[in-house]
Design a protein with these regions (language model features):
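Noncatalytic, basic helical substrate-engagement surface that gates or grips nucleic-acid strands
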Residues: 2-140, 144-166, 241-243
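Non-catalytic nucleic-acid-binding/docking modules located in mid-to-C-terminal regions
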Residues: 2-6, 50, 54-64, 109, ...
């Protein structure tokens, strides 16, 4: 991508922008043909506001907006109930998806998506490549799933809250540092993504267990050492679904 030391890449979670715009604004249609455009309008306003706010010494040298390709990804092949509880996208939002891609390109910003992969996957891949090339990365998103990427050379920025999220910010949210976020999520589950986890184990308890045992594999290997009977039982009985 022509990227290296001294460069600063911003990766925008475009799919999150679209849904935020859709739910935040009243319906709007194009007078000429009745095409829904409310989410597109909101998306463009958000993107324009972002561009106005990034001037300064810490401005990015590269920017890309990343989109989900579809509702199906390789994770559905691994776990067929993944996100199965989510309803399909609203009918009036579907025709706006391609329009947001066109709008992104009209802003002269790179627009990326890949079949079989979610925006999160592409953001992770691009972020690691950019970091490994010697540059810095800022992920523009409030998605908690992306917090596991935060570390040396990679930070997050929640544009809605005007808040930067570094390693300490991740610890404040999860009770663990970024490299153990995925372990906490595996234990506590995620109702948004329909990931089961261990029944009765919440984020705080999961963080305590991970901090006590070091990581998820060690916790499951030594689960018989847990003193609380119910907690010990749920980990032993649900070990396989926790590993999902």
């Amino acid at each position: 991508m022509g990227f290296g030391k001294g460069h600063h890449l911003h990766l925008i979670d475009g799919s999150a922008f679209i849904f935020r715009a859709y739910h935040a604004l009243p319906p709007l249609t194009r007078k000429s043909d009745g095409l829904p455009i409310g989410a597109v309008s909101g998306f463009c306003n958000m993107l324009n506001r972002y561009l106005e706010d990034i001037d300064g010494p810490d401005a990015p040298t590269h920017v890309a907006v990343i989109f989900d390709h579809s509702g199906h990804s390789f994770r559905n092949e691994i776990y067929d109930h993944y996100k199965a509880n989510r309803p399909p996208a609203p009918e009036d939002l579907v025709p706006q998806f391609p329009l947001t891609r066109e709008a992104t390109k009209a802003f002269n910003i790179a627009c990326e998506e890949m079949e079989g992969f979610e925006a999160d996957d592409m953001i992770a891949t691009l972020a690691f490549r950019a970091r490994d090339a010697g540059g810095r990365v800022t992920i523009i998103s409030s998605d908690k799933d992306l917090m596991q990427l935060v570390g040396d050379g990679i930070e997050m920025y929640d544009a809605m809250k005007n808040k930067r999220i570094d390693r300490e910010g991740v610890f404040e949210k999860f009770g663990v540092y970024p490299d153990r976020v995925i372990d906490v999520q595996a234990l506590a589950g995620d109702s948004v993504d329909n990931v089961p986890g261990a029944p009765g184990i919440g984020v705080k308890t999961a963080a305590t267990l991970i901090n006590d045992f070091g990581d998820l594999d060690e916790l499951l290997r030594r689960s018989d050492e847990i003193k609380q009977p119910k907690r010990r039982q749920t980990l032993i009985e649900n070990a396989e679904q926790i590993k999902l």
